[in-house]
Amino acid sequence: MLVITRKKGESLLIGDDIEITVVKLDDGSVKLAIDAPKKLTILRKELYNEVQEENKKATNFNPSILKNIKSK
């Protein structure tokens, strides 16, 4: 893992087309601006983990429960 120190207004580059800039520093939090291609999905880690968990639940679906649904 690479650890980098940045001040407000400073940036770091990832590859040729991703730039992350420190916009604001508060007590215990940092606001970042991310300039990246629109095709790239950017998620907070906690949201990513939540999506992964929901995907796991969806794969555990039991189709036999559909037998109890009456059609109109």
From Swiss-Prot:
Pfam families: CsrA. GO terms for biological process: bacterial-type flagellum organization; mRNA catabolic process; negative regulation of translational initiation; regulation of bacterial-type flagellum assembly; regulation of carbohydrate metabolic process. It is found in: Cytoplasm. Homodimer; the beta-strands of each monomer intercalate to form a hydrophobic core, while the alpha-helices form wings that extend away from the core. One of its GO terms (molecular function) is mRNA 5'-UTR binding. A translational regulator that binds mRNA to regulate translation initiation and/or mRNA stability. Usually binds in the 5'-UTR at or near the Shine-Dalgarno sequence preventing ribosome-binding, thus repressing translation. Its main target seems to be the major flagellin gene, while its function is anatagonized by FliW. NCBIfam families: csrA, PRK01712.1. Belongs to the CsrA/RsmA family. Keywords: Bacterial flagellum biogenesis, Cytoplasm, Repressor, RNA-binding, Translation regulation. The keyword RNA-binding applies. HAMAP family: CsrA (MF_00167). It comes from the Bacteria. The gene is csrA. Coiled coil: none annotated. GO terms for cellular component: cytosol. InterPro entries: CsrA, CsrA_sf. This is Translational regulator CsrA.
